[in-house]
């Protein structure tokens, strides 16, 4: 055996290890081509090539367009500032039209920045707590025909959706008209307000606004404050547009604030967004305690009949007493989908899972005493489900 073969065996003891070595070696040397200069080779026969023309391409105060190169460099000798971006080779270019500004940032005193000021009179950097100047790119159209054409312009997708959007808009308008009509009838028939026509319209609009705000999650108190703020703000805008004088604005503002304060103590909105009589906080607390006591004494730990369901539901939904979260809590407690096992009339012990009695539903529960899964039967009375009134509200 030659010396080369002996050395070969020492380096490659068996075919299995050789295959592992070759495979791992090939996995490590797989070349990934990238769009860089050294992808094809690494010969050094062009070390004397021409320079890359590095340096600034636009100077202080020069006007540049989007995409125009401001600085070519190797490394970040100059850092990108406002309204510019930096490329893979550290080239800084403009992303907005404006004027070049070279500056230092107080938060990075050793870095030099270049940015774009959108106006000639602006300097960089922008003060830290000041709003940044943004360019929206709009130009005023003076030709009426061109302006109307631009307003009516829409994309193809938007154009194809117009029938469906118009149908949805019409449905919403019909719902708002029906709601306004219901509120108008309620104010006229249920409450003795003795309001003028103008004040009646103010009251109607206020109730509609408060109802919309409570439906989107605001509390009744926040909705009342927001409704007052919106009305006063609209008056302020009308005054700024010259539609009324400052004296008229002050008079209307004071009148509405006094009107809202008096009206909110007579009529308010319940948890379902419908008009109801105002209840003072003291009376509301007293009614809540009375209703809760009645529910606990008469409807706890017993079978609930259909008549009991309606009674419990009416007590919980008493207008102006509970908010939505309180009503949800009380319904989960006194009108659960399944009665608790503490209601002994609905529990059947020692039931055969394979042959349960008629009208008994087999279920498994965790026994707290034995710490084991227990098989019991529940009668149909244990499953309350939703009331018809609750389904109508859902």
Swiss-Prot record:
It is found in: Mitochondrion. GO terms for biological process: mitochondrial cytochrome c oxidase assembly; translation. GO terms for molecular function: structural constituent of ribosome. Residues 145-170 have a biased composition (Basic and acidic residues). Residues 1-34 form a transit peptide. GO terms for cellular component: mitochondrial large ribosomal subunit. Keywords: Mitochondrion, Ribonucleoprotein, Ribosomal protein, Transit peptide. The keyword RNA-binding does not apply. Residues 36-57, 145-181 are annotated as: Disordered. InterPro entries: Ribosomal_bL27, Ribosomal_bL27_CS, Ribosomal_bL27m_C. Belongs to the bacterial ribosomal protein bL27 family. Component of the large subunit of mitochondrial ribosome. This is Large ribosomal subunit protein bL27m. It comes from Debaryomyces hansenii (strain ATCC 36239 / CBS 767 / BCRC 21394 / JCM 1990 / NBRC 0083 / IGC 2968). The lineage of its organism: Eukaryota, Fungi, Dikarya, Ascomycota, Saccharomycotina.
């Amino acid at each position: 055996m030659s010396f080369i073969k002996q050395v070969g065996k020492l380096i490659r003891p068996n075919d299995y290890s050789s295959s592992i070595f070759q495979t791992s070696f090939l996995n490590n040397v797989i070349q990934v081509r990238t769009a860089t200069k050294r992808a094809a080779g690494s010969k050094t026969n062009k070390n004397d090539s021409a320079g890359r023309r590095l340096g600034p391409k636009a100077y202080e105060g020069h006007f540049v367009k989007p995409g125009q190169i401001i600085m070519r460099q190797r490394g970040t000798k100059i850092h990108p500032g406002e309204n510019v971006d930096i490329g893979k080779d550290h080239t800084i270019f403009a992303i907005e039209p404006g004027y070049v500004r070279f500056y230092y940032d107080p938060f990075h005193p050793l870095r030099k920045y270049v940015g774009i000021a959108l106006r000639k009179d602006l300097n960089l950097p922008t003060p830290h707590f000041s709003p940044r100047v943004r360019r929206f790119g709009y130009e005023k159209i003076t030709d009426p025909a061109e302006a109307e054409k631009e307003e009516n312009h829409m994309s193809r997708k938007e154009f194809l959706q117009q029938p469906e959007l118009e149908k949805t808009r019409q449905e919403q308008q019909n719902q708002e008209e029906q709601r306004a009509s219901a509120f108008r009838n309620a104010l006229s028939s249920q409450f003795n307000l003795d309001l003028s026509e103008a004040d009646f319209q103010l009251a109607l609009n206020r109730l509609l606004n408060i109802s919309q705000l409570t439906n989107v999650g605001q509390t009744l108190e926040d909705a009342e404050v927001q409704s007052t703020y919106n009305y006063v703000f609209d008056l302020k805008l009308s005054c700024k547009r010259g539609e009324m004088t400052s004296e008229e604005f002050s008079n209307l503002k004071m009148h509405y604030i006094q009107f809202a304060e008096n009206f909110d103590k007579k009529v308010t909105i319940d948890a379902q967004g419908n008009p109801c009589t105002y209840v003072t906080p003291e009376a509301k607390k007293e009614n809540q305690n009375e209703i809760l006591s009645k529910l606990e004494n008469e409807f706890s730990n017993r079978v609930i009949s259909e008549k009991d369901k309606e009674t419990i539901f009416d007590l919980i939904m008493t207008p102006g007493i509970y908010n939505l979260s309180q009503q949800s809590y009380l319904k989960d407690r006194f009108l659960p989908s399944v009665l608790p096992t503490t209601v002994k009339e609905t529990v059947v012990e020692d039931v055969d899972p394979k042959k349960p009695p008629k009208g008994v539903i087999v279920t498994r529960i965790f026994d707290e005493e034995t710490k084991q899964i227990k098989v019991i039967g529940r009668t149909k009375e244990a499953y309350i489900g939703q009331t018809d009134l609750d389904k109508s509200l859902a």
